């Protein structure tokens, strides 16, 4: 059996998140989907898996809502559903950053496409000749599986630690074009908004994150795999899963608890 795995997020005003959560839960359960959906006033964040027809029908229904018409979904395949359950949760944020002064609903973070970034990586600088620094917004557990060659990484275990950890390196970034990246784009979007609000106007987000980069241009300039928070453990640049029984067993225990 071929399972379609999806990742998507969208910052958009949702005034009644619980109502939407109930609707998504009903449609997802009927379709037999597995995974997690997070909903907040600021938007939606989805990691879902299922058979092709079920996935296509679900996203066709969701994107018929004008609020989600621009939702960009990233796809990969596996031989099994990498999630044990189907969960829909209402949260204060769709990715926890705990910076109330940062709102993607008010302004979007400027970004760079995968194809443009690949060109910059080949040259080692942006289109204006300014040196390029890749800034990983993920935690150390994720980074251990892979990151962009020569990327700056931070000693954090949670995304909320990003601002404090970055403070020690600000001077090193002042003369560079900084491209922040994460798994699918949601964390680096908030990170870039905060950095720009904090006076760093030379920062961009990688549109679509690492998975979008893999999907569009492959693994050029990237060392290793991209960690994902499910039973696939990590994906290579061809979006193929790594199957590690020890990590899968650990994940299964956390799903049950």
From Swiss-Prot:
Keywords: Oxidoreductase, tRNA processing. The active site is at residue 182. One of its GO terms (biological process) is tRNA modification. It catalyses: uridine(34) in tRNA + AH2 + O2 = 5-hydroxyuridine(34) in tRNA + A + H2O. SMART domains: RHOD. GO terms for molecular function: oxidoreductase activity, acting on paired donors, with incorporation or reduction of molecular oxygen. Its EC number is 1.14.-.-. Residues 128-222 form the Rhodanese domain. SUPFAM superfamilies: Rhodanese/Cell cycle control phosphatase. Pfam families: Rhodanese (PF00581), UPF0176_N (PF17773). Belongs to the TrhO family. PANTHER family: RHODANESE-LIKE DOMAIN-CONTAINING PROTEIN 7-RELATED, THIOSULFATE SULFURTRANSFERASE/RHODANESE-LIKE DOMAIN-CONTAINING PROTEIN 2. Catalyzes oxygen-dependent 5-hydroxyuridine (ho5U) modification at position 34 in tRNAs. This is tRNA uridine(34) hydroxylase. It comes from Xylella fastidiosa (strain Temecula1 / ATCC 700964). The gene is trhO.
């Amino acid at each position: 059996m071929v399972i379609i795995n999806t990742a998507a997020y969208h910052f958009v005003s949702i005034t009644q998140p619980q109502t939407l959560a109930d609707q998504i839960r009903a449609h997802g359960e009927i379709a037999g989907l597995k995974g997690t959906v997070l909903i907040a006033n600021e938007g939606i964040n989805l990691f879902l898996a299922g058979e092709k027809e079920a996935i296509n029908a679900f996203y066709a229904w969701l994107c018929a809502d004008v609020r989600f018409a621009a939702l960009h979904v990233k796809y990969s395949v596996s031989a099994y559903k990498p999630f044990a359950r189907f969960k829909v949760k209402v949260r204060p944020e769709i990715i926890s950053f705990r910076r109330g002064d940062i709102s993607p609903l008010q302004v979007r973070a400027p970004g760079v496409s995968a194809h443009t970034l690949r060109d910059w990586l080949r040259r080692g600088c942006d289109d204006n000749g300014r040196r390029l620094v890749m800034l990983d917004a993920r935690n150390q557990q994720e980074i251990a599986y892979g990151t962009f060659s020569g990327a700056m990484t931070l000693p954090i275990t949670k995304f909320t630690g990003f601002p404090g950890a970055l403070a020690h390196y600000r001077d090193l970034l002042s003369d560079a074009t900084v491209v922040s990246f994460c798994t699918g784009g949601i964390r680096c979007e908030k990170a870039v908004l905060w950095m720009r609000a904090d006076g760093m106007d030379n920062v961009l987000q990688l549109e679509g994150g690492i998975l979008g980069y893999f999907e569009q241009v492959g693994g050029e300039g990237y060392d290793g795999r991209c960690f994902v928070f499910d039973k696939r453990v990590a994906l290579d640049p061809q979006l193929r899963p790594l199957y590690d029984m020890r990590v899968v067993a650990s994940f299964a225990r956390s799903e049950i608890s």
